[in-house]
Regions:
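N-terminal amphipathic/basic leader segments beginning at the initiator methionine
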Residues: 1-30
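Short, N-terminal intrinsically disordered low-complexity segments that are rich in Pro/Gly
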Residues: 5-13, 32-36, 50-51, 121
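Mg2+-dependent prenyl diphosphate-binding active-site environment of isoprenoid biosynthetic enzymes
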Residues: 24, 36-144
Length: 144
C-alpha cells in the first residue's frame, strides 16, 4: 500500500467518523427535544437509514472542498452530515417497491423491509426536511 493511499484512507476514515458522530447527534432524542414530538419509530427508522454504513465519500468531498476555501470546522461537518441525509433520503425512496423494490441495502434489510412502506416514505421525507433544517441553521455557517 502506498503512503498516499494510506493517507487518503486515514483522512476518509476520520471524516467518516466525524460525520457519523454528527449524524448520531443530529438524530438523537436529546437534539430533537425542542422539536415537535417525533414518533419513536420514525426516529429509529431515520437512524437505521443513515447510521452504521457507507464510506461517507460525499461528505468527505464536501468537507475537503470547504477546507480548500478555508471553511473548516464544525459547520463543514454539519453540512457533510446534511449531505448524507439527502443521500439517505434518495436511497430510502429508491428502494421502495414503486421504484427498485430492493430488499437489501449495505447488507441489511432496506427501510421498507425492516419497517414498512409508509414508514420508509416518511423517513425519506423527514431526512430531506431535516437536511434543509441543518443547512439553514446558523451553526452550519462556515463563514463565521
Amino acid at each position: 500500500m502506498t503512503r498516499a493511499k494510506t493517507a487518503f484512507e486515514d483522512a476518509l476514515a476520520r471524516t467518516a467518523a466525524a460525520v457519523e458522530t454528527m449524524l448520531d447527534g443530529l438524530l438523537g432524542r436529546e437534539s430533537l427535544a425542542g422539536e415537535l414530538e417525533r414518533p419513536v419509530r420514525l426516529l429509529e427508522a431515520m437512524r437505521y437509514a443513515v447510521l452504521g454504513g457507507g464510506k461517507r465519500l460525499r461528505p468527505f468531498l464536501l468537507i475537503e472542498t470547504a477546507r480548500l476555501f478555508g471553511a473548516e470546522g464544525i459547520g463543514a461537518v454539519r453540512a457533510g452530515a446534511a449531505f448524507e441525509m439527502v443521500h439517505g433520503y434518495s436511497l430510502v425512496h429508491d428502494d421502495l417497491p414503486a421504484m427498485d423494490d430492493d430488499d437489501l441495502r449495505r447488507g441489511r434489510p432496506t427501510v421498507h423491509r425492516a419497517y414498512d412502506q409508509a414508514t420508509a416514505i416518511l423517513v425519506g421525507d423527514a431526512l430531506l426536511t431535516l437536511a434543509f433544517d441543518v443547512m439553514a441553521d446558523p451553526a452550519t455557517d462556515v463563514s463565521a
